[in-house]
Structure formats: C-alpha cells, structure tokens
Amino acid sequence: IKGELAASRPWSAWVAEHLRSVDAGRPVEPPADDRRAVAAQATFGFTRELLTTVLRPMATAGKEPTASMGDDTPPAVLGLTARPVGHFLRQRFAQVTNPPIDHLRERHVLSSRTLLGCRHPLLSEEPEAAGMLELDGFTLTPDGLEALKDPALGLCPKVLDATWPVDDGPGGLRAACVRLGEEAVAAVRDGACLLVISDAAADERSEAVPVPSLLAVGATQQRLLREGLATRTSVVADTGEPVDSHQAAALLGYGADAICPRLTLAAAATLDQDPAAAQDRYRDALTEGVFKVMSKMGISVLDAYRGAQIFEAVGLDGEVVDLCFAGTPSPLGGIGLDELAADALDRHRAGQAEVARLENPGWFKHRPGGEYHATNPEVMQALHFTVREGAEMKGSKRGAHLLQQAVKGGGFERYKHYASLVNERPPAALRDLLATSPAGPPVPLDEVEPAADIMARFSTAAMSLGSLSPEAHETLAIALNRVGGRSNCGEGGEDPARFGTERSSAIKQVASGRFGVTPAYLANAVELQIKIAQGSKPGEGGQLPGHKVSAEIARLRHTQPGVALISPPPHHDIYSIEDLAQLVFDLKQANPTAEVSVKLVAEAGVGTVAAGVVKSLADVVMISGADGGTGASPLSSIKHGGAPWELGLAETQQALVANNLRSRCKVRVDGGFKTGRDVLVAALLGADEFGFGTAALLAEGCLMVRTCHQDNCP
C-alpha cells in the first residue's frame, strides 16, 4: 500500500516546484538614538533587570539564564508591580502518564521548522498544497518580515494594527481585541494567506497604545478558530514585547506561526561588538528555550505545539480567557481587560515621559521598593534571630541544648515576631487570600494531637548532597531525626557511613538518573520517594556540571570525578501508570517495611495523575508547588513552570475523594512553607504531611544570596 501511494502522484516534484525556502532576514542595526530606544522599551514593559538578567546572557552566551532558590515573588495577579500578560500563564508539563523529552540529549528529534501560507486539507492531492514558504526557525527580523510582503510570494499579506488610541482609555483594549478578530476574518475571506499582527504603530505615533501581544494574537486566533479559518492563513506577531522564551512559547502556543521581536533584536545588537552575532545568539537561545518548553510535554515538532495552548491561567478572569485563551484551564478567575489595559496605559505614559527611563521592579532579586519577596531580608533576619537564640552560650553545647536554651530564653516570642512578618505580609501566595474561621469553641490543649505526633508529619524537602555541603546535608538529617520528623536526602545517594545513625536521612529518593541507588541505600530508608517532577523545573531533568562532581560525590554516585552527571527528564522505565506501579512494587520488594511516595508537581490535571499514583499502590502522594527552591534551574522554568500548591493540593484531595481513594494514601505538600499558618491552610485543603525546604536551610544559616548555581556561596 505504501509503495502504491508513493507512486500515485509526483509528490517530490510538487514539493520541489512549489515549496520555497526563505530566510529570517538581515540583522537589525543598533539603534541610532538611545533616548528613543529607551522610550520604546519603556512603552513595551522592558525593565533594567530584564535586559541585564535575561537578555544579556542570551545575547552574549547564547543560552537562557540560570538561577537558584526558587521563586518567592507573588503570582502576577497579586504582585505589587505590573506584569506582562505572559506572567499570568503557567507552563504545563508531562508527569507519569507520558514522558517529557530531553531537549539537550535528544535534539535530533526536535524541529523548529516553520511553514507559512495557506494550509490545504490534509488529504489534498494537488500541487498547490505544497505551495508554502519554509523557515528554519520561528523568528524573523524586520527585514525578513518585509520580504514576506513581496507580491511575488503570493501570500497576499494583511497587516493588522495591534494598537488603540490613548484617548479611548481602558475600554480601547477590549475594542481593539474584537476589531483584530473581525479584521482577520475579513482578510482571510478576501484571500490573505499571511496576517501580520503588528504593534509597530506605537513606535511612530505617540497616541498609539500597543495591545499586549498575547492578547492580540490570542484574540485573533480564537476568532479564526470559531469561524473555521485558522488553517487558511498564517500569523506573524510583529511585536516589541517578547524577550524571554516563555513569552515566545506562549505566543506560539496561542497561534503565532512566527515572531518578529524587533525591539529585543535591536537591544541585543547593542550588547556585542558584532551586532549580527549577538542577534544570532539571542535567536539560538530563544529557540533552545522554546524547545525546552515543548519538551516538557513530550512534543518534539514545533508545528505540533503551535496553537496547542498548553498553559493554565492563574489570575485572569473569564472574559479574558474566553476572548483570547478559550479552553485554557483557569480555576481562579482574576483581573480583567480593564486592569490589563490600565497597565498598558501606564507603560505608554512611561514611554512618553520627557525623559523616559526603565524601572527595576525586582522580579528576580529583592530590592527595596520593588516587588515583594516572601524571603526578604527582614524575614530572614527574624528567622535567624529566632533559631540562634542562646548561641552566645559558652562551651560546645549544640543541637537540642541550644533549642532548649532558645525556648527558655524567649525563643517562642521571637518566633511569634517572625511569624507575624510572614502571616501579616501583603498577599504573596494564594493561601494569603484565605481566612480561617473557628469551627466551634476552642478545644482543650490536652485534647489536641501531641506535639510529637505533629512533628512526625513534618519533613524537609529533597535536597541532594550535590546542592548542599555535607555539613548542611547532615545537619538537616540530625535535626529531623531528633524532633521525630523525616529528612529527605534528595537524589544522588547518601554516604553508607551515615546509615543506622542519626545522620541518616529517613527519606531516600529514587530519581530518573538512579545515582547512588544501591540495595543498601534502599534498605536503610523509612520511606522511598520516586521523584517524578521538581517544583522549580517540572518536566525537566537535572545536570550536575563536571566541576561540581567531587571525589566524594563521585564515590556516592558511583561515577568518576569531574564528569558531568545527567538525570533525564523522564524515568525511562516509567511511561505510564502501569510502569509506575511496577517500580513501586520493585521498591517494596527491596524494602518491605518502607513507605513508597511519589513526588508530583501542581498543575491542572494533577488530581487525575494522583489517583493513578494511588492505584499503583504508592503510600504517599506528594504535591510540590511551583515556588519550590532549587540549586540550579533555568530562570524561565523557576518563574513560569507549574502551579501554586494550593491549586494542586485542592484538586488532588477532590479527585481522591471522588474516586474513593483518599483513605488509601497520605497526601504530603511542600513549596514555600514558613509558619504554622501555612501548615494549617494546607491541612484544611487536605494535606496530612508537610515539607519545609528553603525555610529549613535558612534556619541552619543560609544567607539566601541566590548564587547556588554559580558555586560561590559565601
């Protein structure tokens, strides 16, 4: 049959005759007028730290920036500073039910090939069906975009103005989104095979306010889909807004076929003596970043990712979702078009100021007057002060002795001060919006669960010996063993000399690389944890650079010093719930007395996965929040991957109850826990056990410099 079909038409001749390759265009020249460039950047929401923290490494090193210690800023809807629309969309990822792809080691299966033009029906057997333009990637320069308007190419392009008059006020945004959809439908019906959604008018006309590019592309795509016209044209986003891979991935995911990030290319051109090389490196970094986002869902071809809408909205109301992101999970509601328009108007005013300047809002690192950070210097100092009470004692007393001295010396009063800083902060997490109400009169203290039983519900988050020093790693194990909780050794094994002592971690983790997993390791665990995903980079693997692989780490991981160690994104023996059940069974054979837990990360649909985990006979389902800490992760993953644990925990609880599975497991949660109130809210949402990561590190003296990934912590 295959041979008959191959010979039925001159397919290769049709492709050779009709499919034409085009390039991305000539590089952009550095801006001649710096003041005008800054004004344009301010109009589109650029910040100083966006240029230095995100764009500079992309343009100079050709790769996305790496960061550490997780995201402790509020969700975009709760932020003190205005955020781009893309910050309201969280990246989704595969866990258990299908495998993510390793975008670094499996690059040969990835493709950013882009086709522009009208797509004929899938089973069309006509030469014209091959009449499209082919790009190697999804980025265009202004020169390349202009070349697509050549009538000889036959695309009949139509430019749609993605701006609105400033005099129309906030209501102008809604009207502009509706207008874009109507103009797109009319243009496609008139034969336009290329739609250019452009906010370039904002560069030329002071009264033009740019429509946020995601809203412009999303509104256009949704209208085309409703009219059945989406495959009859291609969409190019000509915009000054996107800088990082998350914004680019969102534009592609909501319907853009190609992107012309003209303002970012111009900014990149100023970061190197060779402007063309800087732009090439930026485009390479952007492509790698989009590959990473695609790979999280196991998607290898960009054509399969376009328009797939693999995001969830956190903080957008129903009108915005219905108009621009229809079908996207949005469990919370939030701000609407009027609020987003007000932010756009504020940016426009900043760009029109007599002397425009870029702000430094502190999205990535804490700065006075900037975005709120949950782990800010005041909170850190209060916590350090609390746990160090009694540290001036003479002699070598430590551990429990210092704890006793702290309590006797008023340590609890100091804790209450620390807790008040956290509990009375501006809303920085979804749980801060929840108020507890008494269920009845107070219960006598002697009827409350004993402190020892409560402590047994606490654990530390998984932190490996590769991310912590041996001293810090052992301190956590000793502390949790003494108070009756469980420490988690993370992936990478543990020194056998610690087994059977108070230095032994109760929870031994089994990750995708299986580093350090030996029969003795498994046998010396109270709990064995299968790590499916990590809150700071869900859907991604891990890599320990060779210079960090010391002789000690190499010994524990059964490898060679100086050789980089790779944990792939998926467990290559877990591509389904049935595969997970097999690993759970195997671990219980290795250690019949140990509980087996499975670590997931919050996202829409995690409840269904959790139900499968329980059916695989795991004893504990663990839900990690997106704000979890890390020793090193891509910055875009830290800021935009996964969802808050409050959403994941609530969905998991409801799914397990609905399927009569809740009594068969314990549910544990972690991600940014700092005080007893966090524990209380999590318990009310369904959790049995609670994990502390960053707070535990701070308690033992971490200074939160956020340079773990650079291996130069002071």
Predicted segments with their positions:
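Active-site pocket-lining/capping segments in soluble small-molecule metabolic enzymes
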Residues: K531-Q534, G541, P545-Q560, V609-G629, ...
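N-terminal small/glycine-rich loop or linker at the start of catalytic domains
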Residues: G144-G172, L225-R226, A451-T460, Q534-S536, ...
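Iron-sulfur-associated redox domains of electron-transfer enzymes in respiratory
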Residues: N488-G492, A506-I507, P519, G541, ...
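Flexible, glycine-rich loop/tail regions that form catalytic "lids" or insertion modules at the edges
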Residues: I1-G172, E183-A187, G191-A192, Q247-A248, ...
